[in-house]
């Protein structure tokens, strides 16, 4: 089927500001959509309120409105621009909710605007809890015992019928907002009230809580002709009850039998077809690990966080293909850009393992609850690719920037390990590893956590290897350690070896087809093998520049750094360079396989980056656009003889090191609050006493106010310094007199 020639002018609704549950993945999806529309010769009207996005660039749309994302604003722009079509499935829940409101009011029909892609009826069937439940019943797909409530009293009546505990799921919300697990009527009363307020249609689903079942996702794709494929299966490390955005996710699903896989794949294809979804769709299932019983949890009838993860995990660009389908193309008419030989109706095949690890903001909010549930708390995520689960997991952990390069995390409380295993929190992975090292049986850990035995066995492999390492380093142990994903620094620390054998990583290609066809798009991940597919990949002969990305989205370091990195790449390409980018965030435009000339999906650490430099031999490295993640690597790269492009390593250190910067200001007689650089608790207490309270404590090499604090007495200084010193700082902490007043910022170039 050719392009729908009735489509001349399309409005695209973005996702607005980054919030928990709706982050950079929608800029990635929206930017892909705008590019596809422009390439098709369609006039694009973009509405988004977030200026720190690639999609709001002039090159990606004909008309750009940086306006509040409200129904009133969208109506006003539709009246002015008169688009014939509206694409709403790529802007997260925001765009979907607004489009549905305008459709229900009859505004779209009255002004000749049609929803392209998935229509309003299909969206309603997926998002409205009662309609969804009715549809599942009609096609014979099992759902968890549940009922709809529109008020608190009804929710209490439902819970008394189906039995506690129950999960509350508000309709038309994102990231589990307003939901939660209630074990008592008192808890349900609070959660139901919150959930009703969170739902734009004041509707909640009260559902039986099935503790211990596996949570499995299928990312699917369907065109208007009814062709449907499963793009990717994904499995949550945590059982049902933890929001998928807060769970470690593995792709493809690794613990399913063939019967279980085929059963859930068939169910996902039945569901997307019955709902009438046109484009990408995410289906979530609960699977009883002790039988073949399963239940449908929910469906997202739009591009989602899981879509971005599945796209980067497989190399199958879900947002791009969703947009082409919305334009009228069918799956067999859309080419696979990575192989250049297959079409979009081929289901991707993975010959590697992908692990996603969430990035939580608890370092910013030290006193907040770390308990994980159905409301998402993570601000971002990292992704790692490797031949094995163990290697992918260790890559993800060190790439998450949580000051860890192994699973040996210091406990946060004095509780014994078995007690801590009962806590569903962000430290659970590390607590499980601690328990395995302490000799707790896999069966006992599974009984407490309900984490699948397969994952526990893989973690035990690492625990046993570390115990073996304590006996000393050998060549064989070194190679096993590298294949498990350990860095040289970690292996030296765990073995006590002063000198290690050395082996550099080689790079394999993501090709969507399990190496059945040669890939044309250079998208690489590291492993320890004999053949390096990156070295063998043909080069243009141009000089190469390596750009470091910014890693996971976190408070203080958000999508604006991806925006900067992408513009850096585009500019360098225009200047005639081959550009290589290194990043590990699956939500971003920078990790699109066609942004740079070559993409390395790797952790942003010294060893990982140096291995890439050895293969690529760039004339220099750009660190200026990767936020604090890239800046922190400057000293190491400079000391290794790598040229830093832009501001020199010495210049960066002068600005980032608090003590050196203070001395610079002093030498130029520039006024600033009186301050002193300190490295110990005693120095900090003495400085604070001399300056007089309140004082401001600020570490070096941080962003977004990370670990900055105003303190009012010696006890607060002691508490702060103990926390900072436990992270192993290299540069001074500045103690300066806190001054009340206005703050001004000036950008210079």
Where are these regions (language model features)?
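ATP-binding N-terminal substructure of ATP-dependent carboxylate-amine bond-forming enzymes
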Residues: 1-141, 150-157, 396, 508-670, ...
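ATP-dependent carboxylate activation and anion-phosphoryl transfer catalytic cores
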Residues: 2, 27, 32, 39, ...
């Amino acid at each position: 089927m050719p392009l729908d020639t009735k489509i001349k002018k399309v409005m695209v609704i973005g996702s607005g500001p980054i919030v928990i549950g709706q982050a950079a993945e929608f800029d990635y999806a929206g930017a892909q959509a705008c590019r596809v529309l422009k390439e098709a010769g369609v006039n694009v009207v973009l509405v988004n309120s977030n200026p720190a996005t690639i999609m709001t660039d002039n090159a990606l749309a004909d008309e750009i409105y940086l306006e509040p994302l409200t129904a009133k604003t969208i109506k006003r722009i539709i009246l002015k621009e008169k688009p014939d079509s509206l694409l709403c499935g790529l802007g997260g829940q925001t765009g979907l909710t607004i489009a549905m409101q305008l459709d229900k009011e009859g505004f779209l029909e009255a002004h000749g605007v049609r929803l392209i892609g998935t229509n309003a009826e299909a969206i309603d069937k997926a998002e409205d809890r009662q309609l969804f439940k009715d549809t599942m019943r009609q096609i014979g797909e099992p759902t968890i015992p549940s009922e709809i409530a529109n008020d608190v009293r009804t929710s209490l009546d439902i819970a008394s019928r189906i039995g506690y505990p129950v999960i509350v799921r508000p309709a038309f919300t994102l990231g589990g907002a307003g939901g939660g697990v209630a074990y008592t009527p008192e808890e349900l009363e609070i959660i139901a009230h919150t959930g009703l307020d969170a739902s734009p249609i004041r509707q909640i689903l009260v559902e039986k809580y099935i503790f211990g079942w596996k949570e499995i996702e299928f990312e699917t794709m369907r065109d208007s002709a009814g062709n449907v494929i499963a793009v990717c299966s994904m499995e949550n490390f945590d059982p049902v009850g933890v929001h998928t955005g807060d769970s470690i996710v593995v792709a493809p699903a690794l613990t399913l039998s063939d019967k279980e896989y085929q059963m859930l794949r068939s169910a996902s294809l039945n569901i997307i077809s019955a709902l009438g979804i046109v484009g990408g769709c995410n289906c979530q299932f609960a699977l009883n690990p002790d039988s073949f019983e399963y239940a449908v949890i929910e469906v997202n009838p739009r591009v989602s966080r899981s879509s971005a993860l599945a796209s980067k995990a497989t190399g199958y660009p879900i947002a791009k293909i969703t947009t082409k389908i919305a334009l009228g193309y069918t799956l067999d008419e859309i080419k696979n850009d990575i192989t250049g030989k297959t079409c979009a109706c081929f289901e991707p095949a993975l010959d590697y393992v992908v692990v996603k690890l969430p990035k939580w903001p608890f370092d910013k909010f030290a006193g907040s609850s770390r308990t994980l549930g159905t409301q998402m708390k993570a601000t971002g995520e990292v992704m790692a690719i490797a031949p094995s689960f163990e290697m992918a997991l260790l890559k993800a952990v060190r790439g998450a920037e949580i000051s860890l390069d192994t699973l040996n995390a210091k406990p946060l409380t004095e509780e014994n390990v078995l007690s801590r295993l009962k806590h569903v929190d962000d430290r659970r992975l590390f607590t499980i590893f601690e328990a395995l090292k302490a000799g707790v049986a896999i069966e006992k850990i599974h009984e407490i956590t309900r984490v699948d035995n397969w994952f526990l066995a893989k973690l035990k492999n690492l625990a046993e290897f570390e115990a073996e390492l304590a006996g000393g380093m050998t060549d064989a142990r070194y190679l096993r350690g590298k294949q498990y994903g350990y860095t040289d620094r970690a292996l030296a620390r765990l073995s006590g070896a002063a000198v290690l054998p050395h082996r550099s990583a080689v790079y394999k290609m993501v090709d969507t087809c399990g190496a059945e066809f040669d890939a044309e798009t250079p998208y690489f991940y590291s492993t320890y093998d004999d053949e390096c597919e990156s070295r063998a990949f043909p080069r243009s002969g141009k000089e190469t520049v390596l750009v470091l990305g910014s890693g996971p989205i976190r408070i203080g370091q958000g999508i604006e750094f991806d925006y900067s990195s992408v513009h850096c790449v585009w500019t360098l390409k225009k200047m005639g360079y081959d550009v290589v980018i290194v990043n590990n965030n699956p939500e971003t435009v920078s990790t699109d396989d066609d942004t740079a000339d070559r993409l390395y999906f790797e952790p942003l650490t010294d060893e990982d980056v140096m291995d890439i430099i050895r293969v690529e031999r760039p004339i220099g490295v750009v660190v200026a656009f990767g936020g604090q993640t890239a800046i922190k690597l400057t000293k190491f790269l400079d000391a290794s003889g790598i040229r830093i492009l832009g501001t020199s390593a010495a210049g960066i250190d002068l600005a980032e090191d608090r003590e050196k910067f203070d001395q610079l200001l002093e030498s130029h007689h520039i006024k600033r609050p009186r301050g002193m650089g300190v490295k110990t608790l005693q120095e900090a207490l003495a400085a604070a006493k001399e300056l007089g309270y309140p004082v401001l404590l600020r570490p070096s090499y941080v962003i977004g106010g990370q670990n900055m604090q105003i303190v009012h007495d010696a006890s607060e200084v002691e508490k702060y310094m103990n926390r900072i010193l436990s992270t192993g700082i290299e540069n001074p902490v500045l103690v300066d007199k806190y001054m009340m007043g206005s703050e001004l910022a000036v950008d210079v170039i």
